[in-house]
Design a protein with these regions (language model features):
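An N-terminal domain-cap segment
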Residues: 1-63
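Catalytic micro-motifs at enzyme active sites that drive phosphoryl/nucleotidyl and oxygen chemistry
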Residues: 14, 36-39, 58-59, 77-83, ...
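A general structural signal for short secondary-structure junctions and capping/turn motifs
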Residues: 16-19, 62-64, 82-83, 88, ...
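Short, surface-exposed beta-edge/turn micro-motifs
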Residues: 22-25, 45-47, 67-69, 132-135, ...
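A structural signal for short, well-ordered beta-strand segments and their strand-loop junctions
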Residues: 26-28, 73, 135-139
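General beta-strand recognition
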Residues: 48-51, 71, 137, 213
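Short, structured beta-strand-loop surface elements
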Residues: 55-118, 133, 142, 222-224
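C-terminal edge-of-domain segments
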Residues: 107-260
Length: 260
């Protein structure tokens, strides 16, 4: 009888989280060198608003009447310095077009409301001698996420229905803090690993509402293990309680020590 996998975010949820927290994004068009895109924002209709140098090849190609086929690659890096730092990659394929000039100001406002990215100031202007950027639309045709376990495609309707993980923004700082200042927490969590995986360098790898992931770095390679919470959590209070349960701290689970 197959062993059930522990609860985990869906592929659509993972893509939505990477869209928010990705530490690298590249825009590629056949026949041109891929370029960094400092803005990559998923809009309500499923298109991505992206930016590229106003005088660059991407903007020129997107200026054609029919646009051009393009791929947006988002990289999800682990927040710690690991031997294999890339946790997942997301590829968004679609048709790239320039945003008509009259629509740019309103679209910038929409993006800035959710993500006040300083690079938005470079669209149609050049503050502090930075590169002038153009705002482009990538009309999504397909979305794929890949990690060490394989690749999975996601329908656009499922992508729009999903939401980013509630902890994707604080995940990096939280894991860095635990790894640097609270190794005792990591040691307690590591005690829940299979005995065969307890030898090696154990580091926090990921955090989401379903649980924690640990990376075990050994001479024979890396092993990732999910430690699921008893139930999904949606706020910091619930997160703290769930982690204490994983650590095996009885009094912090809601019990109280006897007095007297």
């Amino acid at each position: 009888m197959p062993v059930a996998s522990p609860p985990a975010p869906s592929a659509a949820e993972r893509i939505r989280s990477v869209c928010v927290s990705a530490t690298g994004a590249m825009l590629a068009v056949d026949g041109h060198t891929a370029v960094d895109t400092p803005v990559h924002h998923l809009l309500d209709d499923g298109a991505f608003a992206v930016t590229a140098a106003a005088d660059g090849d991407m903007t020129a190609a997107a200026g054609n009447a029919t646009g051009v086929e393009a791929v947006l690659e988002l990289t999800d890096h682990a927040p710690l310095a690991l031997r294999s730092p890339v946790r997942s990659l997301v590829w968004i394929r679609g048709r790239l077009r320039r945003v008509p000039a009259p629509l740019v100001p309103a679209l910038l406002d929409v993006i800035a409301t959710d993500d006040p990215n300083p690079s938005l100031l470079q669209v149609n202007s050049v503050p502090c001698n930075d590169t002038q950027l153009s705002l482009l639309w990538l009309q999504t045709e397909s979305a794929v996420i890949a990690d060490a376990t394989g690749a999975e495609s996601v329908e656009l309707r499922d992508l729009l229905a999903a939401r980013p993980d509630p902890f994707c923004v604080l995940e990096s700082s939280w894991l860095q803090h635990i790894d640097a200042d609270h190794r005792e927490v990591v040691d307690l969590l590591a005690a829940r690993l299979p005995v065969s995986l307890r030898r090696g360098r154990i580091r926090p790898l990921g955090l989401d509402r379903y649980g924690l992931r640990l990376r075990v770095e050994r001479a024979d390679g890396e092993h990732d293990v999910r430690l699921p919470f008893a139930a999904p959590v949606n706020d910091v209070t619930g997160l703290g309680r769930a982690i204490r349960v994983l650590m095996g701290c009885p009094f912090l689970n809601g019990l109280r020590a006897r007095r007297g």
